[in-house]
Amino acid sequence: MRTGRMSRKTKETDIQLELNLDGTGIADVNTGIGFFDHMLTSFARHAEFDLKVRAEGDLYVDEHHLVEDTGIVLGKVLAEALGDMAGTARFGEARIPMDEALADVALDIGGRSYLVLKAEFASPQVGQFSTQLVKHFFETLASNAKITIHASVYGDNDHHKIEALFKAFAYAMKRAVKIEGKEVKSTKGTL
């Protein structure tokens, strides 16, 4: 099974995370930030990954450290679960609507970190979640998982736009990690 787990404790956060790429979409997430929990749960459900997250942090400061460190840990665990990536499809893409919002995500899990995100948010927050952290979360995740993500979203409702992004990311990841043979998808023979 393609799984990973990690515990990371700093002076700002304490995070335990488990991931199973060959799961059924079971999520058990508690970060103390309701909207972020909703996004991570949605990601797991739609990617059909099993995800368990326990995260505590200095939320009395703000949610930045907790969201950032969750991105670090999820990225590292994702890289661990992918292993040498032999047989994986490597590339994934998805286009997901949510009412008036439409998100597009294309990604490559081939070991190169990069993020391009085209998104604008009208509100500074959705619930207790700063909309500035959408880009930062995906940057941190991409860097630590060593994946390239191109994403864009438009719409009127910030909740819908962010949720459409997380769902599009989920479906793109689901396609990228799918086993399609035994070889590494690279002309180099390795990633």
Curated annotation (Swiss-Prot):
Catalytic activity: D-erythro-1-(imidazol-4-yl)glycerol 3-phosphate = 3-(imidazol-4-yl)-2-oxopropyl phosphate + H2O
Subcellular location: Cytoplasm
Assigned EC number: 4.2.1.19
Gene Ontology biological-process entries: L-histidine biosynthetic process
Keyword set, alphabetical order: Amino-acid biosynthesis, Cytoplasm, Histidine biosynthesis, Lyase
Broad class of enzyme this protein falls into: lyase
One Pfam family cited in the UniProt record for this chain: IGPD
Cellular component per GO, a single term: cytoplasm
Pathway entry: Amino-acid biosynthesis; L-histidine biosynthesis; L-histidine from 5-phospho-alpha-D-ribose 1-diphosphate: step 6/9
GO terms assigned for molecular function: imidazoleglycerol-phosphate dehydratase activity
Keyword Amino-acid biosynthesis part of the UniProt annotation: yes
PROSITE patterns: IGP_DEHYDRATASE_1 (PS00954), IGP_DEHYDRATASE_2 (PS00955)
NCBIfam families: PRK00951.2-1, PRK00951.2-4
Family of this protein: Belongs to the imidazoleglycerol-phosphate dehydratase family.
Protein name in the entry: Imidazoleglycerol-phosphate dehydratase
